[in-house]
Curated annotation (Swiss-Prot):
Organism annotation: Dendroaspis angusticeps
Propiece residues: 39-53
Protein name: Natriuretic peptide DNP-2
Keyword Oxidoreductase in annotation: no
Top-level taxon of origin: Eukaryota
Record's subcellular location: Secreted
Entry's Gene Ontology BP terms: regulation of blood pressure; vasodilation
Keyword match Ion transport: no
Top-level taxonomy: Eukaryota, Metazoa, Chordata, Craniata, Vertebrata
One Gene Ontology CC term in the entry: extracellular region
Keywords: Calcium-activated potassium channel impairing toxin, Disulfide bond, Hypotensive agent, Ion channel impairing toxin, Potassium channel impairing toxin, Secreted, Toxin, Vasoactive, Vasodilator
Record function comment: Exhibits vasodilator, natriuretic and diuretic properties in animal models and human tissues. Acts by stimulating cGMP via the natriuretic peptide receptor 1 (NPR1). Is a poor agonist of the atrial natriuretic peptide receptor 2 (NPR2). Is not degraded by neutral endopeptidase (NEP/MME). Binds to atrial natriuretic peptide clearance receptor (NPR-C/NPR3), which may be responsible of the removal of DNP from the circulation. Increases calcium uptake and induces histamine release from rat peritoneal mast cells.
Family named by the database record: Belongs to the natriuretic peptide family.
Paired cysteines (S-S): 7-23
Tissue-specificity statement: Expressed by the venom gland.
Length: 53
């Protein structure tokens, strides 16, 4: 008997991207834009905030 898996998880191209259609519990591990901007701001010591100090 083959069990139905609502998470497809099939490879969709040759560089191993995987489809997670049907899996709302799986999140994209990439940071959101505001989080990425905070990281970039914190990594650059030449930002305007650090020059004011």
């Amino acid at each position: 008997e083959v069990k139905y898996d609502p998470c497809f998880g099939h490879k969709i191209d040759r560089i191993n991207h995987v489809s997670n259609l049907g899996c709302p519990s799986l999140r994209d591990p990439r940071p959101t834009a505001p989080a990425a901007l905070r990281i970039i701001r914190d990594l650059h010591p030449d930002s305007k905030q650090s020059q004011a100090a």
